[in-house]
Structure formats: C-alpha cells, structure tokens
C-alpha cells in the first residue's frame, strides 16, 4: 500500500513538473512550441503565428480524414443494404420453391 501511495505522489509531481515547462505554442525553444523549425524556435509573434498555422493545418487534415471516413461508412452501409435486398429476394425465391413442392404433393 505504501508503494502505491509513493507511486501516486511521484506521478502527480512528475505531471506538475512537466506541465510547468510547457509554454504557449510558438514562444521559442524549450517551450511547448520549440523545435518546429527556425521561425518557431525564434519565438515571438512569428513563432506563435507559425504554431497557429500548423494547428489549423492539422485540424483541417483531421476534418478531411473524418469526412472521408464518414463517406466510406455510408458507402459500406449502402452496399450492405443492397446485399440484404439481394439475399431477401433469394430467400423469397427459395420459399416459392418450397411452396411449389408442397403444392405438388
């Protein structure tokens, strides 16, 4: 039990320490936005602008991917509905054959 409490304390302090090192994106090297290129590493308004552009780009890519995924699922649904209709016709055809066999008896 003591080990569990010690671990919890370690993780919470580790999270606090790492969150203190994060800064605003694009504010320079060593902060949350550093290392993304020379403009972002320099910090300042150009770094923040570059970080904002990058975030906007990735949000747009995510929206495009979600739209493509939604379209794919809609196509899959349409395909399966058509397959259900085809199989239902097959079932009806076989039921008709069974009725015909019963009628012939």
Swiss-Prot record:
Residues 22-51 are annotated as: N-terminal inhibitory region. Its main location: mitochondrion. It is found in: Mitochondrion. It comes from the Eukaryota. Residues 25-38 have a biased composition (Gly residues). Residues 58-105 form a coiled coil. GO terms for biological process: erythrocyte differentiation; heme biosynthetic process; negative regulation of mitochondrial ATP synthesis coupled proton transport; optokinetic behavior; protein homotetramerization; regulation of neuroinflammatory response; visual perception. Keywords: Coiled coil, Mitochondrion, Transit peptide. InterPro entries: ATPase_inhibitor_mt (IPR007648). One of its GO terms (molecular function) is ATPase inhibitor activity. Residues 17-52 are annotated as: Disordered. Signal peptide: none annotated. Disruption phenotype: Defects in circulating erythroid cells. Embryos are anemic despite normal expression of the erythroid cell markers. The erythrocytes from embryos that survive to adult stage exhibit hypochromic, microcytic anemia. Histological analysis of adult haematopoietic tissues does not show morphological defects. Defects are due to changes in the mitochondrial pH-and consequently the redox potential-to change to a level that reduces [2Fe-2S] cluster-containing fech activity, thereby reducing heme synthesis, resulting in hypochromic anemia. Residues 73-105 are annotated as: Antiparallel alpha-helical coiled coil region. GO terms for cellular component: cytoplasm; mitochondrion. Endogenous F(1)F(o)-ATPase inhibitor limiting ATP depletion when the mitochondrial membrane potential falls below a threshold and the F(1)F(o)-ATP synthase starts hydrolyzing ATP to pump protons out of the mitochondrial matrix. Required to avoid the consumption of cellular ATP when the F(1)F(o)-ATP synthase enzyme acts as an ATP hydrolase. Indirectly acts as a regulator of heme synthesis in erythroid tissues: regulates heme synthesis by modulating the mitochondrial pH and redox potential, allowing fech to efficiently catalyze the incorporation of iron into protoporphyrin IX to produce heme. Forms an alpha-helical dimer with monomers associated via an antiparallel alpha-helical coiled coil composed of residues 73-105, leaving each N-terminal inhibitory region (residues 22-51) accessible for interaction with an F1 catalytic domain. The inhibitory N-terminal region (residues 22-51) binds the alpha(ADP-bound)-beta(ADP-bound) (ATP5F1A-ATP5F1B) interface of F1-ATPase, and also contact the central gamma subunit (ATP5F1C). Belongs to the ATPase inhibitor family. Homodimer; represents the active form and is present at a pH value below 6.5. Homotetramer; represents the inactive form and is present at a pH value above 7.0. This is ATPase inhibitor A, mitochondrial. It comes from Danio rerio (Zebrafish).
């Amino acid at each position: 039990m003591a080990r569990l409490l010690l671990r919890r304390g370690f993780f919470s302090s580790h999270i606090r320490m790492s969150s203190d090192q994060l800064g605003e994106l694009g504010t320079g090297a060593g902060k949350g936005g550093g290392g993304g290129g020379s403009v972002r590493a320099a910090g300042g308004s150009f770094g923040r602008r570059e970080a904002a552009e990058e975030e906007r780009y990735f949000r747009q890519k995510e929206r495009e991917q979600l739209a493509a995924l939604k379209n794919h699922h809609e196509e899959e649904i349409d395909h399966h509905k058509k397959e259900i209709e085809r199989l239902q016709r097959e079932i009806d055809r076989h039921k008709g054959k069974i009725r015909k066999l019963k009628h012939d008896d």
